[in-house]
UniProtKB/Swiss-Prot annotation:
SUPFAM superfamilies (alphabetical): FAD/NAD(P)-binding domain
GO molecular function, one term: oxidoreductase activity, acting on the CH-NH group of donors
Species of the source: Shewanella amazonensis (strain ATCC BAA-1098 / SB2B)
Any matching Pfam family: DAO
One biological process term in Gene Ontology: methylation
Annotated protein name in UniProt: tRNA 5-methylaminomethyl-2-thiouridine biosynthesis bifunctional protein MnmC
Reported function: Catalyzes the last two steps in the biosynthesis of 5-methylaminomethyl-2-thiouridine (mnm(5)s(2)U) at the wobble position (U34) in tRNA. Catalyzes the FAD-dependent demodification of cmnm(5)s(2)U34 to nm(5)s(2)U34, followed by the transfer of a methyl group from S-adenosyl-L-methionine to nm(5)s(2)U34, to form mnm(5)s(2)U34.
Gene3D superfamilies: D-Amino Acid Oxidase, subunit A, domain 2, FAD/NAD(P)-binding domain
Annotated spans, FAD-dependent cmnm(5)s(2)U34 oxidoreductase: 264-665
Keyword terms: Cytoplasm, FAD, Flavoprotein, Methyltransferase, Multifunctional enzyme, Oxidoreductase, S-adenosyl-L-methionine, Transferase, tRNA processing
Entry's family note: In the N-terminal section; belongs to the methyltransferase superfamily. tRNA (mnm(5)s(2)U34)-methyltransferase family. In the C-terminal section; belongs to the DAO family.
Gene of this entry: mnmC
EC number(s) reported in the record: 2.1.1.61, 1.5.-.-
GO CC annotation terms, alphabetical: cytoplasm
Length: 665
C-alpha cells in the first residue's frame, strides 16, 4: 500500500483523535479465508494486555471486553460478511487505527514490510527480508535491540526449534543475556517466532532449515544508529538495504512485571510449573504436603512418554503432538541431574480387534515422522528386540523416564534459580485475603499473593475446588525383575498394558497399570498384580519372553491419577462455581441464557489457578502445559492455540452447557 493511499485512509481518523491517545502500532497479518480467496488482516498489539476474541461485523472490530477497537474498512465489498478470530494479543486502552487490506496471497512478510510504511515522518531505518532461505546465523552491530521474526512453514521444523528447550532461540530457553523475548504465534498452517537479539556484535545461531521452510524478517526495534544487518545465507552475506519508514517504537509486549506466585504440589505439574515461572523471572514459593517431590502419582520408577492421539484433529491431538515433542526436550534439559531416562521409542500394538481397528484409524492419518510411523511385524520385532510378530504404530521420540527423579531434577534446577521450597506442609483450607490468599496449615497461616493448586488427587479437598469435574483413578504398577530374554527388550511396549525396558538404576522393569475409578487407596493388591500380568500375556500370547515376567516378589507401587471427563487436563483460573450457579439461577437456560454466557465471562476466584487432571499421560503433557500456564500468568502468548487453551480451561464443563442454553445438572 502506498504512502499516499495510507495517508488518505489514516488522516480522517487520526484527526479525530486526541494526540495522547494515538498509540504506536505494530501490525501482524492474519490470513482470512473467504471462499477460495485468502485475505489478510493486520491487527495491533500495543502496550495494554487484554485477551479475548475479536468479532468482525460489517466493517467494525469489537473485542469482547470493556475496550473498543475502531475498525476502518477500505474495501467493504470484500468484508461484508461476519467473521471472528481468536485474539490473545495486547489491545490498546484508547482508540487506535487498524488497517484492513485485501491482497491475492503475497508472501506474508511482504505484507508486514508494507504495513510498516505508515508515516514518512518517522526516522529511516533498515530492514532485511529473506524468503525460502537457509539461514545459519544472524548478527548485528547496532546500538539497540534487533527484532527477528521467523516464519516456519513446516511443522516438523517448527517443533525442532520452538519445542527445543536447549536451543538458544527457543521461547523456553531465553537465558542468554543477548537474546530476549520469545513468543510463538500460530494460525492455520503458519507458525512463527518473535524474539530480540539485544547485545551488539552477538550472533544468534539458527538450526539449518530446508530453504523452502523458513522466511525471516529482520528489522530494528526502535531507533537505530548505523544499523547493519548481516545474514549468513548459503555461504554469502546479504545486506538488508530496504528502508521502509517505520514507527520509532514497536512494542509488542507489555512491560514485564515479576509476580509473587505460590504453588501447592511438587509432582510433575507443580515442579515443571515452578521451573517455567522462574525462567520467566517470577518469584516462586512451593509448598508440598509430602516429605519430598514426586511422592504421589508422580512417584513411579518408570513412566512412558508417548502422545494420546486421535484420528480426528481434535483438542487432544493438537495438545499432545507438540506436548509430546517438548516433553523429550524438557527431560533432556535436566539430564545433568541424576535422572534415569531412555528415549528408546514406544511401540503400540493392538491386543484385540477393537484396539487394532483403532490403531489402523490412527495410521490412516498422516503424522510427522517425528511423532508416529507405521511399522509391520518384522519392523516391530527389530525395534523391540524380542518377538512381537504384529505391526502397529511406533513413536520414535517416545521412551521412559523416572517420574519421581524428574520431579526431583526439576525442583533442584528451580532452586538454582531462586525457588523457595517447604515440604511437610499440609494445607487444610484456603481463604481469600486482602492481598491474595491465606493458606491454613497444621502449624499456622501462610499468605500468598497468587496461588496455583497442583495437588493431584487432593485438588478437590478444598472448598473452592470441590466441584471440579475430576475423578480419581487408582493405578498399581508392577515391578518385574530382569530375567532371561527380558534383557533383550529395547523399547517400551504398549498394548492392553505397558512394559518398559530395564531400568539400570533399579535392575527391574515396570508393568502396568490398573485403572480403578473412585479408589484412593495406595495399598498393595495382589489381584491388580495378577491383572497386570494377564494384560501382558493377553497382548502377546505365546511369546517366549512373556514367560519370564515374574511378579512373585509382590513388588509394586500404587498412585492416584486425576482424570477429567474429556481426558484433557485442567490449567487456568479456578472457577467460582457458587457464583456461576447464582448467575445461572437468575438467568436460567435456553436462548436467553445462551446469549448471556456467550458474551459474559464466567466468574473465577481472583488470583487462584488450577493445574490438574493430567491423568496417565502427565509426563507427556505436563511440561508444555506448564509453559502455557506460565505464559498466561506472565501476560504473554501461550504456545498452544487459543482454542486448545480454552479446552484446558477448568470452567469448560459448565460453559459448554451454558453457552448452548442447556440446563446444569
Amino acid at each position: 500500500m502506498s504512502d499516499s493511499v495510507t495517508s488518505c485512509l489514516l488522516l480522517p481518523i487520526l484527526e479525530t483523535m486526541p494526540m495522547p491517545v494515538i498509540t504506536t502500532l505494530f501490525m501482524f497479518y492474519y490470513p482470512f479465508r473467504t471462499g477460495s480467496t485468502n485475505f489478510s488482516a493486520p491487527i495491533v498489539s500495543p502496550l495494554a494486555l487484554l485477551s479475548g476474541q475479536l468479532s468482525i461485523k460489517g466493517g467494525k472490530i469489537m473485542p469482547i471486553s470493556r475496550h473498543r477497537v475502531n475498525f476502518f474498512n477500505p474495501m467493504p465489498e470484500f468484508f461484508a460478511i461476519d467473521m471472528a478470530m481468536p485474539l490473545s494479543l495486547p489491545l490498546p486502552e484508547g482508540p487506535c487505527v487498524v488497517l484492513f487490506e485485501a491482497l491475492p496471497e503475497p508472501p506474508l512478510w511482504q505484507w508486514l514490510l508494507a504495513a510498516a510504511q505508515v508515516n514518512s515522518a518517522y526516522p529511516e531505518t533498515n530492514a532485511a527480508y529473506a524468503s525460502n532461505a537457509s539461514i545459519t546465523s544472524i548478527q548485528h552491530t547496532s546500538k539497540k535491540p534487533l527484532q527477528i521474526i521467523m516464519l516456519l512453514k513446516d511443522e516438523a521444523e517448527l517443533n525442532a526449534l520452538a519445542m527445543d528447550a536447549s536451543h538458544p532461540l527457543s521461547p523456553f530457553a531465553m537465558a542468554a543475556s543477548h537474546i530476549k523475548g520469545g513468543q510463538r504465534f500460530h494460525l492455520d498452517d503458519n507458525c512463527w517466532l518473535d524474539f530480540y537479539l539485544c547485545e551488539p556484535n552477538k550472533a544468534a545461531t539458527l538450526a539449518t532449515f530446508d530453504k523452502a521452510s523458513i522466511d525471516v524478517l529482520i528489522c530494528p526495534k526502535g531507533e537505530f544508529e548505523q544499523a547493519a544487518l548481516e545474514l549468513a545465507h548459503q555461504g554469502s552475506i546479504l545486506i538488508g538495504d530496504t528502508k521502509p519508514d517505520m514507527p520509532a517504537a514497536l512494542p509488542i509486549k507489555p512491560p514485564f512485571k515479576p509476580r509473587d506466585i505460590s504453588i501447592v504440589g511438587a509432582g510433575v505439574a507443580g515442579a515443571s510449573l515452578a521451573l517455567s515461572l522462574l525462567r520467566r523471572g517470577h518469584k516462586v514459593t512451593l509448598y508440598c504436603a509430602d516429605a519430598a517431590p514426586g511422592i504421589g502419582a508422580s512417584g513411579n520408577r518408570q513412566g512412558a512418554i508417548y502422545p494420546l492421539l486421535t484420528p480426528e484433529d481434535d483438542h487432544l491431538t493438537r495438545l499432545f503432538v507438540p506436548a509430546f515433542l517438548y516433553a523429550k526436550r524438557f527431560v533432556e534439559s535436566l539430564a545433568h541431574h541424576p535422572l534415569p531416562f531412555d528415549f528408546c521409542g514406544v511401540l503400540q500394538t493392538g491386543h484385540d480387534e477393537r484396539a487394532t481397528e483403532r490403531i489402523e484409524k490412527l495410521l490412516s492419518k498422516t503424522w510427522p515422522k517425528q511423532v508416529a510411523v507405521r511399522v509391520d511385524a518384522d519392523e516391530a520385532n527389530h525395534i523391540a528386540g524380542v518377538a512381537i510378530d504384529k505391526g502397529g504404530i511406533y513413536y520414535p521420540q517416545g521412551g521412559w523416564v523416572s517420574p519421581a527423579k524428574l520431579c526431583e531434577a526439576a525442583i533442584e534446577e528451580a532452586k538454582t534459580m531462586g525457588l523457595e521450597c517447604h515440604f511437610d506442609v499440609n494445607i487444610t483450607s484456603i481463604t481469600r485475603a486482602d492481598e491474595g490468599w491465606r493458606l491454613n496449615t497444621q502449624t499456622g497461616e501462610i499468605d500468598a499473593h497468587e496461588l496455583v493448586l497442583a495437588t493431584g488427587h487432593r485438588i478437590t479437598e478444598l472448598a473452592q475446588t470441590k466441584s471440579l469435574q475430576l475423578a480419581p483413578f487408582r493405578g498399581q504398577v508392577s515391578h518385574v525383575p530382569t530375567r532371561g530374554k527380558l534383557e533383550q527388550l529395547k523399547t517400551v511396549l504398549c498394548a492392553h498394558g505397558y512394559f518398559t525396558p530395564r531400568d539400570a538404576s533399579s535392575g527391574s522393569h515396570c508393568m502396568g497399570a490398573s485403572y480403578v475409578r473412585g479408589d484412593t487407596s495406595v495399598e498393595y493388591r495382589e489381584q491388580e498384580q495378577q491383572e497386570n500380568l494377564h494384560k501382558m500375556q493377553e497382548s502377546y500370547p505365546g511369546k517366549d519372553w512373556v514367560e519370564y515376567l515374574d511378579i512373585s516378589e509382590g513388588s509394586a507401587r500404587a498412585g492416584i491419577r486425576m482424570v477429567s471427563r474429556d481426558h484433557l487436563p485442567m490449567a487456568g483460573a479456578a472457577p467460582d462455581v457458587a457464583a456461576i450457579q447464582t448467575q445461572y439461577q437468575a438467568i436460567g437456560h435456553g436462548p436467553k441464557g445462551a446469549q448471556y454466557w456467550q458474551t459474559h465471562a464466567a466468574p473465577v476466584h481472583p488470583g487462584l489457578y488450577i493445574f490438574s487432571g493430567l491423568g496417565s499421560r502427565g509426563l507427556s503433557s505436563g511440561p508444555l502445559i506448564a509453559e502455557c500456564l506460565a505464559d498466561s500468568l506472565s501476560g504473554t502468548l501461550p504456545v498452544l492455540d487459543g482454542d486448545v487453551m480454552e479446552a484446558l480451561n477448568p470452567n469448560r464443563m459448565w460453559l459448554r452447557k451454558l453457552k448452548k442454553g442447556k440446563a446444569l445438572d
